[in-house]
Amino acid sequence: MKVTSLDGRRLRKMLRKEAEARCVVLDCRPYLAFAASSVRGSLNVNLNSVVLRRARGGAVSARYVLADEAARARLLQEGGGGVAAVVVLDQGSRHWQKLREESAARVVLTSLLACLSAGPRVYFLKGGYETFYSQYPECCVDAKPISQEKLEGERGLLSQCGKPILSVAYRPAYDQGGPVEILPFLYLGSAYHASKCEFLANLHITALLNVSRRTSEACTTHLHYKWIPVEDSHTADISSHFQEAIDFIDCVREEGGKVLVHCEAGVSRSPTICMAYLMKTKQFRLKEAFEYIKQRRSVVSPNFGFMGQLLQYESEILPSTPTPQPPSCQGEAASSTFIGHLQTLSPDMQGAYCTFPTSVLAPVPTHATVAELHRSPVATATSC
């Protein structure tokens, strides 16, 4: 069995001809994007970073790929339980052969080929959800439908970029509304917001800072534009770009302009840059910076790796504050400092990134015998 590529037109026919009973669509995008807008009847495959890291592009258990027990049992039946096709999609990839090894779509495809030796054919949707939803919005569902009156008004508009505005009834949550003001000269939004010239003109935006994998040419001819390519991955190094981004924002501010910082969804990478800017220039603590931005753009959710880098950045640029009750032992402190700090944050902030493996939270056992301690007369920890 092999993976076959298909376009949106063919998927649309399959959904109509086969109905949902004969075609299973597996959406490998993050749950936030899936919950906001998805192919009708599709299932979300939400593989966490630990599973992806261990898989390294290889196969994982079917229970990770198909969390829905009924769907899993049916597909694993002899002959696929009557299912003729399993379609895998991500946000916008055009070729499954070029998928990154650590991508969820790559792991899902490999796993399906391993567990479905016979039965349903495995397909990959070219162009991903972005292309399909722009072509066939009637085959998709959105969590936040917009009133018919507003929809009819939007349909009659043309953007200043010369392209028709897509039906906003199927726009993901992170693209709803417009860019938000973080500071009088600093705005935060998504790639969609950055592509809409009317948004930029209304807010008097003079510069764009793109922190995503792909550069953009839309509406950039008359704007000061900077592109910092960063993956939205817990292993990506974003902190090395903090100063570069801060310098660019300050340059725009000094010239009396306004800058829109964006990535793909305006959820992880660009909010991380904005938090770093607040921490550096306003001396905000990480908790303060996160809550400040969360109040203005509720969908922000930096990944766990970015939060760790922001925490490290805080320790480098801001004076340390004494903790009221330090850990009782140095070994305990070494294993729990980072997690303990995050657990003191607000509930919203704790839920904003991936769940850390619970094994890290467990105390580290000490197997070696403890020799007599020769304590310094100057600094003696009485709690150990």
UniProtKB/Swiss-Prot annotation:
Residues 178-319 form the Tyrosine-protein phosphatase domain. The keyword Transmembrane helix does not apply. InterPro entries: Dual-sp_phosphatase_cat-dom, MKP, Prot-tyrosine_phosphatase-like, Rhodanese-like_dom, Rhodanese-like_dom_sf, Tyr_Pase_AS, Tyr_Pase_cat, Tyr_Pase_dom. GO terms for biological process: endoderm formation; negative regulation of DNA-templated transcription; negative regulation of MAPK cascade; negative regulation of vasoconstriction; peptidyl-threonine dephosphorylation; peptidyl-tyrosine dephosphorylation; positive regulation of cerebral blood circulation; signal transduction. SUPFAM superfamilies: (Phosphotyrosine protein) phosphatases II, Rhodanese/Cell cycle control phosphatase. Its main location: nucleus. Disulfide bonds: none annotated. Residues 19-141 form the Rhodanese domain. GO terms for molecular function: MAP kinase tyrosine/serine/threonine phosphatase activity; phosphatase activity; phosphoprotein phosphatase activity; protein serine/threonine phosphatase activity; protein tyrosine phosphatase activity; protein tyrosine/serine/threonine phosphatase activity. It catalyses: O-phospho-L-tyrosyl-[protein] + H2O = L-tyrosyl-[protein] + phosphate; O-phospho-L-seryl-[protein] + H2O = L-seryl-[protein] + phosphate; O-phospho-L-threonyl-[protein] + H2O = L-threonyl-[protein] + phosphate. It is an enzyme of class 3 (hydrolase). One of its GO terms (cellular component) is nucleus. Its EC number is 3.1.3.16, 3.1.3.48. It is found in: Nucleus. Keywords: Hydrolase, Nucleus, Protein phosphatase. The active site is at C263. The keyword Methyltransferase does not apply. A motif (Nuclear localization signal) lies at residues 53-74. Belongs to the protein-tyrosine phosphatase family. Non-receptor class dual specificity subfamily. Dual specificity protein phosphatase; active with phosphotyrosine, phosphoserine and phosphothreonine residues. The highest relative activity is toward ERK1. This is Dual specificity protein phosphatase 5.
